């Protein structure tokens, strides 16, 4: 019997996206170009987080393969992702979020 069940398996780099509401003035002060993404080192990350220290960020799973898998899960496709996840708060947040999106 032929297996007709659809599933998707992705391998990628799990990341955590921190989402913070910012004004155009905030972006100018921080030297950030609107509508872009940039990986930053720990020093730059601390600088940006310190600037927004009074605003609680929202955390979302990121990375191109994991984002694709999350989208597939949202379409009702059995979806799985593999990647190295740290044993820290961000790793816990990541696992919690992808499970809520229905990813295995």
Give names to the regions the model predicted:
Residues 84-85, 97:
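"Short basic amphipathic alpha-helical interaction patches in structured regions
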Residues 97-104:
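A glycine-rich helix N-cap at a beta->alpha junction
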Residues 1-82, 89-93:
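Glycine-rich phosphate/adenosyl-contacting loop at the front of the ribokinase-like
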């Amino acid at each position: 019997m032929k297996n007709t069940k659809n599933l998707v398996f992705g391998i990628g780099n799990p990341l955590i996206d921190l989402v913070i509401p910012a004004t155009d003035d905030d972006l100018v002060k921080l030297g950030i170009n609107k509508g872009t993404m940039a990986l930053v080192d720990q020093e730059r990350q601390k600088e940006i987080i310190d600037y927004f220290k009074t605003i609680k960020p929202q955390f979302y799973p990121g990375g191109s393969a994991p984002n694709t898998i999350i989208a597939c899960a949202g379409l009702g496709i059995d979806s799985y992702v593999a990647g190295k996840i740290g044993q820290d708060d961000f790793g816990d947040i990541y696992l919690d979020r992808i499970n809520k999106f229905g990813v295995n």
